[in-house]
């Protein structure tokens, strides 16, 4: 959606507090950005 979850975008926050990204990216907790796995 161009807002979160894709590469170099912020991690998406779920209602339960988890930070997630779209496949295949992973959330880097130290920067809260989505990067390569």
Curated annotation (Swiss-Prot):
Disulfide bond positions: 4-12, 11-27, 21-34
Keywords: Disulfide bond, Ion channel impairing toxin, Neurotoxin, Potassium channel impairing toxin, Secreted, Toxin, Voltage-gated potassium channel impairing toxin, Voltage-gated sodium channel impairing toxin
Cellular component GO terms, alphabetical: extracellular region
Predominant cellular place of this UniProt entry's protein: secreted
Residues forming coiled coils: none
Superkingdom of the source species: Eukaryota
Subcellular location: Secreted
Tissue specificity comment: Expressed by the venom duct.
GO terms for MF: potassium channel regulator activity; sodium channel regulator activity; toxin activity
Biological function: This toxin reduces the outward currents that are due to the opening of voltage-gated potassium channels in DRG neurons. In addition, leftward shift in the presence of this toxin is observed in averaged normalized conductance-voltage plot of outward sodium currents (Nav1.2/SCN2A).
Further comment: Exists in two forms, due to cis-trans isomerization at 23-Asp-Pro-24.
Domain notes: The cysteine framework is XXXII (C-CC-C-C-C).
Protein name, entry field: Delta/kappa-conotoxin Mo3964
